[in-house]
Amino acid sequence: DGVVITKYPNNGLKTEGNYVNGVRNGEWAEYWEEVWWYDYGEDGEANTRDTLENNNRWDSVEVIIPNFKPKLKTQGNYLNGNRDGTWTEYFEDGKRKTELNYTSGKFNGLQSYWNPNGNKIEEKNYIDGKQQGLRTTYFEETGIKKEETYFKDGVQQGLWVEWFNDGQNKRERFFTDGERDLSLI
């Protein structure tokens, strides 16, 4: 029990969090692996021949170890070994990738997803692990709404609308218990 820290083979911080009674409990974080490399030469590029070096050979070795601050990869809370509350995942550049909400290890609440450019690509809601209510997807390049549909107890239900990437309506369909009823457009 207590704080546990794990590290990558290069000794960079990998995870940190708390255990209570042998299970994860409280805030946990996972970090991206830090990059360390060797430079053979004066140009700062690994494995290249440098014109300023003697006889154009790899005759010097430098170890470059940047002063990294660990970059978050994933962060959230555990309660009795289960994910609980908001969990956020990040791209390596620090931008948000996902925000997922949990209760006792099950999706519960709004789930949001972004692409590497920062555009939201999907948003959906869950209640007790089942998709419930509105689900919206967006075009990755523009962030313009692409599709919208509804779910009840994890099954597609009601109107489904799809748009072109210029925002114009493409088609609409109606679903009952996950089955398409008819094409409206």
What is each stretch, according to the model?
Residues 1-44, 51-185:
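Glycine/tyrosine- and acidic-biased, solvent-exposed loop/turn segments at the edges of beta-strands
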